[in-house]
């Protein structure tokens, strides 16, 4: 990005943030409950997640896995009670991880520690913030407590990441205070196809909006925002930037170094890897290979080297998404 473009980006982002904060104050004036809690400035939140760009965040369930992730070069870990594949197999209600496990992971490694909360469950999120995690994932992998309303993330000092299958979903989550977006994909399947579909859908709409902006057709951007129930200012900023105004990671079904390189090639800023590493039979080598391929995704020789580090025979057993029932699709949760 050119220096001039960077200044324009920061100016537009600052303007947007002030408007979002004004909206928060308006909600407070209208009587909506807004606890008097310490909040970090949006730029601090965005600054933290920006430092994760180009890296890999790995799902873990214990300190031993977290140590493997750190030694492999991960930029962070995401602590769960069960890996997405096991959540899918176990059924029942999936909740946030055991606080003791999160604390053990935090004391075992030096890289940022994240954790998931259920969609709409403000007090799981508050517990995670009190524990001191660096990033909260309001995740469709866990069982939602509210299918129609997400957490008001402006009330937290900890940055949030949310999943999205489309640009309107992504912009709605950003409007709610998400500092980071990721593709939803279809977690726990070892099949990257849905993540590919989602990032292409997002990219398609961004390309379209950017075309409107370059042609001076702001009315078309306004129509898009109204038809898709997203704030016009966010749609306009996205159109001007030609990308999402926050960091956008890939997630859902990434199981090999080649999968990670593919998502980076499609425009992701980094990747989350869920079950793909620790449901495989070669987690240490696979973790190193995925980090290598993510870092050097634009160098085919290095991606080949990374792919040689893993064995297909050791890969997690994948799930054919076409055989899943509609109620089994996690990506449908919380739109």
Swiss-Prot record:
Entry GO MF terms: pyridoxal 5'-phosphate synthase (glutamine hydrolysing) activity
Catalytic activity: aldehydo-D-ribose 5-phosphate + D-glyceraldehyde 3-phosphate + L-glutamine = pyridoxal 5'-phosphate + L-glutamate + phosphate + 3 H2O + H(+)
Bilayer-spanning residue ranges: none
Assigned keywords, A-Z: Lyase, Pyridoxal phosphate, Schiff base
Chain residues that bind D-ribose 5-phosphate: 59, 188, 253, 274-275
Domain of life: Archaea
Annotated S-S bridges: none
EC number: 4.3.3.6
Pathway: Cofactor biosynthesis; pyridoxal 5'-phosphate biosynthesis
Family from the record: Belongs to the PdxS/SNZ family.
Biological role stated in the UniProt entry: Catalyzes the formation of pyridoxal 5'-phosphate from ribose 5-phosphate (RBP), glyceraldehyde 3-phosphate (G3P) and ammonia. The ammonia is provided by the PdxT subunit. Can also use ribulose 5-phosphate and dihydroxyacetone phosphate as substrates, resulting from enzyme-catalyzed isomerization of RBP and G3P, respectively.
Protein name: Pyridoxal 5'-phosphate synthase subunit PdxS
Originating species: Desulfurococcus amylolyticus (strain DSM 18924 / JCM 16383 / VKM B-2413 / 1221n)
UniProt gene name: pdxS
């Amino acid at each position: 990005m050119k220096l001039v473009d960077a200044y324009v980006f920061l100016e537009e982002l600052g303007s947007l943030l002030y408007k979002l904060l004004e909206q928060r104050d308006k909600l407070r004036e209208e009587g909506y409950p807004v606890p008097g809690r310490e909040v970090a400035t949006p730029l601090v939140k965005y600054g933290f997640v920006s430092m994760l760009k180009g890296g890999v965040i790995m799902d873990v369930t214990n300190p031993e896995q977290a140590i493997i992730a750190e030694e492999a070069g991960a930029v962070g870990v995401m602590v769960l009670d069960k890996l997405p594949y096991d959540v899918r197999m176990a059924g029942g209600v999936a909740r946030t991880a055991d606080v003791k496990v999160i604390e053990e992971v935090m004391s075992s490694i030096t890289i940022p520690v994240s954790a998931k909360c259920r969609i709409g469950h403000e007090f799981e999120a508050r517990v995670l913030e009190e524990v001191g995690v660096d990033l909260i994932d309001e995740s469709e992998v866990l069982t939602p407590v509210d299918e129609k309303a997400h957490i008001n993330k402006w009330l937290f000092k900890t940055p949030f990441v949310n999943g999205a299958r489309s640009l309107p979903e992504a912009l709605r989550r950003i409007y709610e205070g998400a500092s980071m977006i990721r593709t939803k994909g279809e977690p726990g399947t070892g099949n990257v196809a849905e993540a590919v579909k989602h990032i292409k859908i997002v990219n398609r709409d961004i390309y379209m909006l950017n075309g409107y902006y370059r042609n001076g057709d702001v009315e078309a951007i306004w129509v898009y925002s109204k038809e898709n129930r997203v704030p016009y200012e966010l749609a306009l900023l996205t159109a001007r930037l030609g990308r999402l105004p926050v960091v956008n990671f890939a997630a859902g079904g990434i199981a090999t170094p080649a999968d990670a390189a593919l998502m980076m090639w499609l425009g992701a800023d980094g990747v989350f890897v869920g079950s793909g590493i620790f449901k495989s039979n070669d987690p240490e080598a696979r973790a190193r290979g995925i980090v290598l391929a993510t870092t050097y995704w634009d160098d085919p020789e290095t991606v080949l080297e990374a792919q040689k580090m893993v064995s297909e025979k050791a890969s997690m057993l994948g799930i054919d998404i076409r055989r899943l029932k509609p109620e089994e699709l996690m990506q449908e949760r919380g739109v």
